[in-house]
Amino acid sequence: MRSDLYTIAFTTIITVILGLGLSATADSLRERQVLNEELDIKKNILSVLGYKQDTPWTNEEVQSLYDANISEIRIDEVGSVIEELDKNEDVSYTIYQSSENDKVTGYAIPIAGKGLWGTMYGYFAIEPDAETVKGITFYKHKETPGLGAEVDKDWFKNNFVGKKLTNKNGELVSIEVIKGYVSDTDPDAPHKVDGISGATITGTGLTTFLKSDLQKYEPYFAKVRSVNQIESL
């Protein structure tokens, strides 16, 4: 009887110890996973804003570069900066502003929407003038390799650089991914990029959700353009 009680007690203690150990390990792995995801996001933001180097960044370099150059601005749906985030705030959007020597060098916003096979996630960067494209990047998608998956290739992303988000009247028109190639004689060429052969649905999806996301931030960037215009006088 005593032997049975000892066995039960011993087994219970070992089970509890192993359970606590596994729980602690799982918590540690989750924390590390969350940290890696946060660093990957920061790396993508830095990259789309033009921060690059020949060798891969270490985690410490990513964090240091981000802390030194990127500030997060939260705005409401009318483009006003939210100084203190209210838990009851219905809508808020985040802008990642890059600066060097107290001078704004660009803005990045998160973008996401449906491609052919699922949701595409990325970041879109805008020059300090709030109307010229600085860059675009995608970090997660389910598009077909060799077709829609070309969205994360340099040749496609580079097509966006220098394009204009607004027309001559200063109105947001966004960027359209067309089928085929953009003609130099097209008056709307500044607002269009070459499409991906065989991936029309991916391009159409990108065109749609990019404009939708930009419209959320337009009240803020319209104010930036107004300030820039006044300062240039």
Write out the residue ranges for each language-model feature:
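Flexible, solvent-exposed loop/hinge segments and secondary-structure transition points
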Residues: 2-233
